[in-house]
Amino acid sequence: MGMSAFEVLGPIMVGPSSSHTAGALRIARVARLLAPRPLARVDFTLFNSFSRTHRGHGTDKALVAGILGLDTDDERVRDSFALAEEAGLVFSIVEGGDDASLHPNTVRISMHPAEGRPVEVEGESLGGGRIRISSIDGVGVNIKGELPTVFVAHRDKPGVLASLTGALGARGLNIATMRTFRAERGGAAYTVFEADEQIPDDLIDEVRGIAHVTFASAVNVAGASQQEAGDVTLSFSSGARLAELCDERGCSIGSLMRASEAERCGDETLADARMDRVLALMHEEVCETLSFPRPSLGGFLNGQAATVARSAALLAHPLMGGTLTSAVAYAMAVLERSASMGVIVAAPTAGSAGVVPGAVLACGEAIDADSTALSRALWNAAAIGALISENASVSGAEGGCQAEVGTAAAMAASALVELLGGSVAQCLDAASICIGNLLGLVCDPARGMVEYPCQNRNAIGVAAAFSSAQLALADITCPVPFDEAVDAMARVGKTLPESLRETAQGGLAVCPSVCEGCGGCV
């Protein structure tokens, strides 16, 4: 398994969408590394789902923020247009419409430096904040950032590649991959190097001095699934292998994922500190929103979470019970914060970010769990989310809402089982039951915004997680193993029509009552 826990419980970001906001920002932030600075003008052309829903998702603001170098958790993202004006950067947002040959979340970024020729970069947002750079100046590339990466623009001349590889080798860098792309013989070419070691800061200046090199840059792709070193022993790519490792070590899923992350980053203390930050922000995104609700960008959300919490005394006993009522209110609160462009933890996406914290925090309060137990439950959730991310999808544009809320609910169900002392097998059963119960759930954001029905579906995701966890803990086994359920999720996602995959062109998004207040299709 190549994913860090914090690629699943993350990014920490300004809402409302991990793919359309955080992912878009990251594409633009990488693109700016591939062109000389300063930039005088940038033109963004959006395709497919990006084109149709960019206003409601804050994609336009995120792209400009990325070009300015802001990070996903910078609250100035919402003010990026004004920041660009202050910086003297001219930009345009163009809706490119549909192109079946492109990924559902594609943007083409044309950058015009103050000096030098323009550079055009095409990128894709893969879900959960992960991205891929797919083309530079019309030449196909594949930059995901899985290893330390160097991008070099040069002329297609004899001896250039030898000089480049010699420069990297002289610094002790082992080249893992080297791919050269050219538009024509003797013309513009690009070489992308991936190395096993980190890129020294001064190496780029040296590379820029090589004959026929026109530009060079180290490329850091935030959110990339970093490939593991050879001494990482706790790697797993299936639920079956995860269960085997837990059995071999006599530990829970959460404990194994924590140990795997410690191996990955080489520092157990650092891994724990990062999870402490995630847990603290989850508390904050719930508590602050319940105490101080604020309206969402689209106006659908404004204090519904607090209303649910206040209704508990009257409604909890005959209906959901106290713990589930709290969990639903907490989940709804996270969506309200995200929809007002507040800072949240995508878990695994922004559109489904309420399910895991809602379930884990509410259940933790009910049993008086300490922070160690809560963190272990989150480690567990991260393991389940990583497996689904790698073997199916967490992108609504690829797999519908089953990929987002369905994944989050499966993560939460497994986490609840571990929090309540269940076995590894029961955790995987709970996740499998949950996937089955939400299979085929469509993504149909009204007016292209991550508000309605997204908030309500987070509430339903919490309820699905609670019921699935209780079934598993009662030893109700699932006839379909976890890995097969994930495979089914992937297959179903591919069969969903495009209108039901985050395009706002089907389902509830096209109901007359929703469309009346839109003022124009997004």
Write out the residue ranges for each language-model feature.
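Acidic-glycine-rich active-site phosphate/pyrophosphate-binding loop
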Residues: 1-5, 36-40, 321-338, 372-393, ...
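Conserved phosphate/anionic-ligand binding catalytic regions in large, soluble enzymes, centered on
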Residues: 10-30, 341-359, 403-408
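Alpha-helical support elements that line or immediately flank enzyme active sites
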Residues: 21-35, 158-160, 357-368, 413-421
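A structural-propensity feature for long, helix-poor, extended segments
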Residues: 43-86, 380-415, 430, 437-464, ...
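A conserved regulatory-domain signal marking ACT and ACT-like small-molecule sensing domains
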Residues: 75, 91-93, 120-229
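Functionally critical mobile loop/hinge segments
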Residues: 79-86, 90-93, 418-522
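C-terminal regulatory domains involved in ligand/effector binding and gene-expression control
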Residues: 126, 222-225, 229-313, 519
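Active-site cofactor/substrate anionic-group-binding motifs, chiefly glycine-
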Residues: 307-348
